[in-house]
Amino acid sequence: MIPASPDAAADDWLQWRGPLGTGISEETGVPQKWSQTENIRWKVKLDGEGNSSPIVVDSKVFITHAPTGSAQRELRCYDRSDGTLLWTKGAEYSEKEITHQTNPLCASSPVSDGERIVAWFGSAGLYCFDLNGEQRWKVETGKVDHIWGYGSSPIIYQNLVLLNFGPGVNSYVAAFSMKDGAEVWRRTFPEQVSSKHEEYRGSWSTPVMMRQGNSETLLLSMPDRLWAVSPLTGEDRWSCGGLSKLLYTSPLIAGDVVVSMAGYNGPAIAVRAEGTGDLTDTKRVWLHEKGNPQRVGSGVVVGEHLYILNEPGIAWCIHVPTGEITWKERLDGASSWSSMTAVDGHLQVNTMKGSTILLQANPTACQVIGINELGEMTRATPAYSNGQIFIRTYQHLYCIEESQ
């Protein structure tokens, strides 16, 4: 059982966390050293803060963006060769939209099938554009109503856009047609919906696809429970309990084991993805109930080990088959919301103070091999494509490349 296979070219970075949404890149030759004066191909000024991450489609780089003080929700397209802004499209949403100061609007990353781009603008709706910026369709998805805003990114499976809408009183998961935006299925999970004033319940988790035998399964980290459903119909396949009310990270896949990690000091679970129905008592491999940190960024699995940088800036390595924590280490004295990526034989992850930490995927000891400073706040996750790294900070979008 493995992550579902992508249909697009390996060099493109078509969604948050890369081709499979797992934080694993096949890129080689990416820079290992950079700063404001080294290996910067270009940088462009951004007129608004944001937590969403860039994606790369052929010669174009895309981000979602909300200009400071504006009602606009934007999808921006840049030329990857020099950072020229090619076009800006989106929507105007003049109603008040609740979010938190740490989570600016347009927090969801776009996704592409290589021909079209889909962006979720929260209460402003779900939009689809072609690569030239022509709008193909839009869907009114409802109003997001949660004190901390939204953050899950849409993903594409076959001809469907899959969206974890929420958190808040209107939460649901749905599939929409890539052709015209028509709703194919929608469902709400029992624990997913919070009351009007329930701050500490909800899922900001981006779903992940997993191949099981000859079929593929949609994995969803939801309050209290990890769910596996059919991406085509939304019907249950299996679930596993043991989580808490707040979920930020995406599920992680290690062979036939799926790991889901709650946020806000909540538990982590691992379940063997075999069978149907409630697998809590029969297939749950381990449960970490105590001593858990706040987790916002997702980890990455290399071999049998999971590596993650938690929000307080403490990295963990976990042996997935047993749940043993093989090491913990505070890194660079900075907190992080960014997700970790395995690329070119090592690990990379951003911190909020604008550094990117490089580590060896060493299961026996924390081994930092480099720290690169840009010195600007970031909560986004880098994109990797054709030897280049794209980093979105609160001030700029960067293209990082080895100098010739």
Question: How would you label these PLM feature ranges?
Answer:
Residues 1-3:
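Bacterial N-terminal signal peptides
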Residues 5-404:
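Noncatalytic, solvent-exposed loop/strand surfaces
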